[in-house]
């Protein structure tokens, strides 16, 4: 009896451990196809929980109908096959085009890929309970231990995967390992055979199946979701990272694009640091050039490094500039040096930590002429970097006339995040001291695009800025400033909220972007 209980505890531990590994891996393996957002994790958690729930119900029926050890063995074997199927299915379905919105597409993908493995793993515990309970007088003790070991497996699976396994093994190697562990568990604990000859036959067949599946797995499942222009692919602790060759906006120059999850974040021309392909980065540069001309100093803090496109250009433009970059992912910083043209002996100071943590703990009060927020994208906005409290912390590090700049991807007509973020900054910097700068003069009729929000407690003389860049650049001007009166009218017309640490519904505010950018697709 004691031996059976120990065996049962090990089995439920393994099943729960593997379930949580699959759940955490799901977010990473889906990222190149649908990004990482609240909607992605909502679908993953919901589908996995639904699978476990239905699996527990079906497992109870199976346990009563087939109360023998081989039932457990076949479930462990099937769950191993299910784990091995995740990567091939992701490659197959992730590339498919669905005539539906992105949110529904995410739900469809997660259901097809993760429901069956979760459901089979959910069947295991009821079968284990049925096979273990022989003495009703000790039911509470036995069931309590089973639940304890099951929960322990979930806990260790969570921490081991998040803190260690993904960064050490990568998602596809990890899924391969999970599949093999479950299949081996079927052989060790499953009771699939009781006599020596059938055992030998089964082991031979199982070995052939495992080797065949491993070959198929490596042949197709390890095929990364990349094209022939992608020459670097890696999963870091924070992103799925890709670097690919692409043409610049003028379609004349080859550049290197840094892709974080699904989104091209930076485009760098390796031997031309002054090439700024993105319009919003050119707006940043125009504002800094104007400020440098007027004050002669340029101390800049970047929240989000990405490809270090503007920092490396500023280093050459202004040899006396102080440039600090806070980039949470040290692997991105390494790639910037190795592939994206940032020299090893750079004057740029990099800090690999969370942007808010850095700002909150910085002793450099009143140091910076500019703080540049470049950590937002359309599908995944770090909500803790959008709040009034964080804006107050950034304002502390700015000089009295220092300027905060942040790029925001939103729809002018339908967007809810942009007006909310502007109103939030007005709470800190004052009404009339926050400005909206667009790369196109017809800013009100453009759809989803990247705009720059500019804020300063002493105000920014945008008329002088516009005059300066007009004189210097003429037709090459990129920055188009919305008149303050029109901006205030816009804020009145659009629904918005003040974003605080207590209430920051960023994913709900960006939902219109999903509908407009990833609505019904036709191909």
What are these regions (language model features)?
Residues 379-386:
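Glycine/threonine-rich flexible loop motifs
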Residues 1-233, 245-254, 262-265, 289-298, ...:
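Alpha-helical transmembrane segments of multi-pass membrane proteins
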């Amino acid at each position: 009896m004691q031996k059976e209980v120990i065996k049962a505890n090990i089995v439920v531990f393994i099943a729960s451990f593997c379930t949580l590994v699959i759940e955490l891996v799901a977010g990473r393996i889906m990222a190149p196809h649908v990004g990482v957002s609240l909607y992605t994790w909502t679908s993953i958690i919901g589908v996995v929980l639904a699978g476990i729930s239905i699996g527990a119900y079906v497992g109870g029926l199976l346990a009563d109908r087939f109360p023998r050890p081989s039932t457990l063995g076949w479930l462990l074997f099937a769950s191993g096959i299910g784990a091995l199927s995740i990567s091939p299915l992701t490659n197959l379905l992730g590339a498919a085009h669905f005539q539906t919105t992105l949110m529904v597409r995410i739900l469809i993908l997660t259901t097809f890929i993760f429901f069956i493995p979760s459901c089979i793993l959910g069947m295991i515990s009821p079968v284990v309970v049925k096979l273990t309970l022989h003495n009703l007088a000790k039911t509470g003790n036995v069931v309590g231990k089973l639940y304890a070991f099951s929960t322990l497996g979930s806990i260790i699976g969570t921490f081991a995967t998040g803190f260690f396994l993904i960064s050490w093994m990568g998602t596809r190697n990890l899924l391969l390992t999970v599949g093999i562990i479950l299949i081996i568990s079927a052989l060790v604990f499953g009771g699939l055979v009781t006599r020596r000859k059938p055992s030998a036959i089964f082991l031979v067949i199982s070995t052939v199946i495992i080797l065949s599946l491993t070959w198929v797995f490596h042949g197709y499942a390890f095929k990364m979701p990349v094209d022939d222009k992608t020459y670097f692919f890696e999963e870091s602790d924070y992103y799925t990272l890709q670097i690919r060759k692409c043409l610049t906006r003028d379609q004349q120059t080859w550049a290197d694009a840094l892709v974080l999850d699904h989104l091209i974040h930076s485009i760098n021309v390796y031997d031309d640091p002054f090439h700024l392909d993105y319009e919003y980065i050119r707006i940043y540069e125009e504002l800094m050039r104007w400020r440098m001309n007027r004050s002669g100093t340029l101390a800049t803090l970047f929240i989000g490094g990405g490809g270090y496109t503007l920092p490396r250009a500023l280093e050459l433009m202004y040899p006396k500039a102080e440039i600090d970059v806070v980039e949470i992912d040290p692997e991105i910083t390494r790639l910037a040096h190795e592939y994206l043209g940032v020299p090893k002996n750079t004057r740029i100071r990099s800090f690999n930590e969370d942007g808010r943590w850095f700002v909150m703990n910085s002793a450099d009060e009143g140091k910076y002429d500019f703080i540049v927020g470049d950590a937002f994208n359309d599908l995944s906005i770090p909500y803790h970097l959008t709040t009034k409290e964080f804006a107050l912390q950034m304002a502390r590090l700015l000089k009295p006339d220092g300027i905060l700049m942040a790029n925001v991807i939103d729809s002018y007509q339908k967007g809810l995040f942009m007006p909310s973020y502007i109103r939030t900054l007005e709470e800190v910097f004052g009404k009339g001291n926050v400005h909206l700068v667009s790369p196109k003069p017809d800013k009100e009729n453009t759809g989803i695009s990247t705009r720059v929000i500019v804020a300063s407690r002493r105000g920014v003389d945008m008329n002088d800025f516009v005059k300066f860049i007009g004189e210097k650049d003429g037709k090459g001007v990129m920055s188009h400033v919305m008149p303050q009166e029109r901006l205030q009218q816009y804020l009145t017309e659009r629904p918005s909220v003040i974003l605080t640490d207590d209430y920051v519904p960023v994913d709900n505010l960006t939902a219109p972007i999903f509908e407009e950018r990833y609505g019904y697709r036709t191909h």
